[in-house]
Amino acid sequence: MQLTDKELEIVEILEKDSRTSNEDLAAMTSLTVSETEEVLKKLEDQKIIVRYTSIVDWSKISGHEGVTAMIDVKVTPKRGVGFDEIAKRIYRFKEVKSVYLMSGAYDLSVIIEGQSMNEVARFVSQKLSTLDSVISTTTHFILKKYKHDGTIFEPDEEDKRIVVSP
């Protein structure tokens, strides 16, 4: 679908900060609030804007450390449905946060979250690897997040450059 310049501008603003109010969106795009609301409804109805989310640094909250793993999955695609059927079976598991079709050495990239490495290991061995089309898996545990969806998790460091003025 082709978006107008204003629609695209709204999408880009909301992608950076989904908490931007309709009034602020209107001011930033030179639209009225009612025009902005119409654009948002259209974008939501057409599933261009799918969901409004927050990025949380869970490592700073005691008791919510958890484990995130990226799993490379090789599968045998089925005639007529390709990778879609197995991807659908995988993304229905509650542990699964994301599934991507990939190019390269493996077919699917699956991101899951669990409370412990053992919980992730049980998911891989008891649920994921037992699916008919799955040939092999390789699990990578995320040790630390530095940047996620464009957001840097490390605190801003002071600028140590010397100020030069005329």
Which residues fall in each region the model found?
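A compositional/biophysical signature of low hydrophobicity enriched in polar/charged and small residues
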Residues: 1-166
